[in-house]
Regions:
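Short, Lys/Arg-rich flexible segments
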Residues: 1-208
Length: 208
């Protein structure tokens, strides 16, 4: 039998992983790779930002408050009685969400910087967080506390809340006041709100 003119021999390639990873972040390579990393993560972060705004406006609490002092309690937080706008005590014509909207709609500044060993530090500036939103949502009558946090942890005095859709002349909101007597045994029903929305946002941002 004739000998084959083709022969195969085993070969192997040894790659120095540490050296390879270091080369990715060294000098010009670091800048070029950093650009590619940023190009990859930017759409992910931008989508997360858009989803954050969408989730905020789609939340039942946001929708109810935006409908003002004549809304129904569609969020279910008040047991179907009255509405959050008048219970919290927002003034007629006021915009409880102006500062929140500034926070969640702010343009994020994404920076990628090479460190060592193929690693990159990703910094996201202007990103909103739960605490900053709580600070931007003070009660109209108590600046040290957040009504948005109260939605999640509970609000007192629901039993003394009187709602009258036809109007109450002494009411800040126009349709609701707190009275001295206990009118009902209703208690506030907490619900996930800003914390849940922000946790989802952060998970989407870091998933890359």
């Amino acid at each position: 039998m004739a000998k084959s003119f083709i022969s195969t021999t085993k070969f192997e390639v040894v790659i120095d992983k540490a050296a390879l990873m270091n080369s990715l972040t060294a000098g010009a390579n670091g800048r070029i790779t950093g650009i590619e990393v940023r190009r990859y993560i930017l759409p992910i972060i931008e989508k997360a930002s858009k989803d954050l705004v969408r989730d905020f406006y789609n939340h039942s609490v946001t929708k109810e408050i935006m409908k003002g002092p004549s809304a129904n309690n569609t969020s279910g937080t008040l047991g179907g009685y009255g509405n959050l706008f008048s219970f919290i005590g927002f003034g007629q014509g006021s915009d409880p969400f102006s500062q929140v909207e500034d926070l969640i709609k702010s343009k994020l500044n994404v920076r990628v910087r090479a460190i060592t060993g193929g690693r990159f530090r990703i910094t996201i500036a202007n990103a909103p967080d739960t605490q900053s939103i709580f600070e931007a949502t003070p009660y109209p009558w108590a600046s040290g506390s957040s009504w948005a946090e109260g939605v999640e942890k509970g609000m007192s005095n629901l039993g003394s809340y009187l709602n009258r859709p036809s109007g109450i002349s002494s009411s800040n909101s126009g349709t609701g006041i707190q009275v001295g007597a206990i009118l009902s045994s209703r208690s506030f029903k907490t619900t996930s709100y800003i914390s849940g929305i922000m946790n989802k946002f952060l998970k989407c941002v870091i998933k890359f």
